[in-house]
Amino acid sequence: MSKKLHIKTWGCQMNEYDSSKMADLLDEYQGYTLTEEAEEADVLLLNTCSIREKAQEKVFHQLGRWKTLKDKNPNLIIGVGGCVASQEGKAIKDRAQCVDLIFGPQTLHRLPEMIEQIQQGGKAVIDVSFPEIEKFDRLPEPRAEGPSAFVSIMEGCSKYCSFCVVPYTRGEEVSRPVDDVILEIAQLAEQGVREVNLLGQNVNAYRGATHDDDICTFAELLRYVAAIDGIDRIRFTTSHPIEFTQDIIDVYEDTPELVSFLHLPVQSGSDLILTQMKRGHMAIEYKSIIRRLRKARPDIQISSDFIVGFPGESKQDFADTMKLIEDVQFDHSFSFIYSARPGTPASDLPDDVSLDEKKERLAILQDRITQQAMRYSRQMLGTVQRILVEGPSVKNPMELRGRTENNRVVNFEADPKHIGSFVDVEIVDVFTNSLRGKFIRGEDEMDLRRDLRPSDILAKHKKDDDLGVTQFIP
């Protein structure tokens, strides 16, 4: 009987990416297959996130439920990974004796050895170190799971915003070598991937080493990826305003594969609050970036992150945030009520905005952005949009579901043969969370660009390197 693995994931897209790599790793090296049912599993892994309030308590509640499974099956292995594990490693083990292994985001590649150690009767393992980019060197080849894929290009963040735990849980910024990134994307393209989403806590800080000891910037990486045949859409998340430089904006002007949609977190529209947050920029500088982006790509749509009720946020500070939202006309947001994260500088500030006031401000902000998003959706009525078809519609499996460049879900009727490819549809109806389309044409009637075949890239990858180093030489 095959060994079963169950992974529960909380948090950002980077965590989703990490969880997929854990599954690939344990499948390749130890033969574990994924199961949706925790009761069936031989190994349970919890990939945690420390961004939201009471993250630690959420972890212990989940571990309490899993403990009942371990009481029935003493051989069950329970592991905790992610940012809460990195931050609270020993405390987790002290409080939850059922946990066998604790690992951080940078040590997930060591999971096979950790599990083997436990199976051989070893003590509980705690490894939350920061071995820089080592984890990427030991992961198996990527496996496509549809036409869209996430590819991590860097880890960590060195900005140290006063409210954020990421530098403490994922370490400082470390970029993957550009050869490794291009090779992974080429492998995915060979498997039918058409869209890549480049991941990192701060992707525009990317500075990847090249084969000749030079440095590849994020703007250069975007152009390399755009040249790969079959990759017709590029997204990235997340970026920071202070490193959104002109060379990146220039890519929007001449690289159509880069989508007309950008998630650029601002957090607040108040200069006072931005200073308290240690964001490193003012509201006018953020708006300057947006103006230059819209000059390069007039139809680009912007989403952002907002924190309401940050310590010291006055009614005027919140009004400044609402003014920024109106000026920029954001299309979407991830917005949260402020709650202190242990160990961050902001946790020492007096939390002087009442919970009721925070809730009211959040509701006002979200309502405004929802109105703006609906206005953008209505403007799409009657237009023809290029859709990447992801699979059957969630609500009606007889229909197909795809995504526009500006990240809207479109449901429409068409032949299932179009799954995994691009189609053009006319937008005929608008709903709060989706659009309805009418099929116009398939990919065989489009003139899609062909530059550099993935097989050409893979052919340049010398698999028998004596040093065990992989290289892609453009």
Swiss-Prot record:
One of its GO terms (cellular component) is cytosol. Residues 143-375 form the Radical SAM core domain. Keywords: 4Fe-4S, Cytoplasm, Iron, Iron-sulfur, Metal-binding, S-adenosyl-L-methionine, Transferase, tRNA processing. Pfam families: Radical_SAM, TRAM, UPF0004. It comes from the Bacteria. Its EC number is 2.8.4.3. The keyword Zinc-finger does not apply. [4Fe-4S] cluster 1 binds at C12, C49, C83. The keyword Ion transport does not apply. Residues 3-120 form the MTTase N-terminal domain. It catalyses: N(6)-dimethylallyladenosine(37) in tRNA + (sulfur carrier)-SH + AH2 + 2 S-adenosyl-L-methionine = 2-methylsulfanyl-N(6)-dimethylallyladenosine(37) in tRNA + (sulfur carrier)-H + 5'-deoxyadenosine + L-methionine + A + S-adenosyl-L-homocysteine + 2 H(+). It is an enzyme of class 2 (transferase). [4Fe-4S] cluster 2 binds at C157, C161, C164. One of its GO terms (molecular function) is metal ion binding. Disulfide bonds: none annotated. Residues 378-441 form the TRAM domain. Binds 2 [4Fe-4S] clusters. One cluster is coordinated with 3 cysteines and an exchangeable S-adenosyl-L-methionine. It is found in: Cytoplasm. Its cofactor is [4Fe-4S] cluster. Catalyzes the methylthiolation of N6-(dimethylallyl)adenosine (i(6)A), leading to the formation of 2-methylthio-N6-(dimethylallyl)adenosine (ms(2)i(6)A) at position 37 in tRNAs that read codons beginning with uridine. Monomer. HAMAP family: tRNA_metthiotr_MiaB. Belongs to the methylthiotransferase family. MiaB subfamily. This is tRNA-2-methylthio-N(6)-dimethylallyladenosine synthase. It comes from Shewanella loihica (strain ATCC BAA-1088 / PV-4).
